[in-house]
Amino acid sequence: MTSEVEQPTAMSEALGYEQARDELIEVVRRLEAGGTTLEESLALWERGEELAEVCRRRLDGARARLDAALAEEADPEDGASGADGGGA
């Protein structure tokens, strides 16, 4: 019972960013609305933490892909595709 929230479950990892974000929004709404038992609130909070981690990982992955693409564009030796308007 020490690291239940640290790693998202395989089912959570299968979610796309938008799905995880939408479910997280719903979890927050339910927590803010109240009316749940302590156990239900704790379960919702744990699920929210898991979903937030999925979102963080998806965003980190997207950021890494963008950084890699921008690095390729910035490397003039890598992108020699004749876009400089070369010759007559």
From Swiss-Prot:
UniProt superkingdom: Bacteria
GO BP annotations, alphabetical order: DNA catabolic process
Region (Disordered): 69-88
This protein's record includes keyword S-adenosyl-L-methionine: no
Annotated Pfam families: Exonuc_VII_S
Family annotation (InterPro entries): Exonuc_VII_S, Exonuc_VII_ssu_sf
Disulfide bridge partners, by residue number: none
Gene3D superfamilies cross-referenced by the UniProt entry: Exonuclease VII, small subunit
Keyword Transmembrane helix found: no
UniProt catalytic activity: Exonucleolytic cleavage in either 5'- to 3'- or 3'- to 5'-direction to yield nucleoside 5'-phosphates
An annotated Gene Ontology molecular function: exodeoxyribonuclease VII activity
SUPFAM superfamilies, per database record: XseB-like
Keywords carried by this UniProt record: Cytoplasm, Exonuclease, Hydrolase, Nuclease
HAMAP family: Exonuc_7_S
Function in brief: Bidirectionally degrades single-stranded DNA into large acid-insoluble oligonucleotides, which are then degraded further into small acid-soluble oligonucleotides.
Annotated family: Belongs to the XseB family.
Name this protein carries in UniProt: Exodeoxyribonuclease 7 small subunit
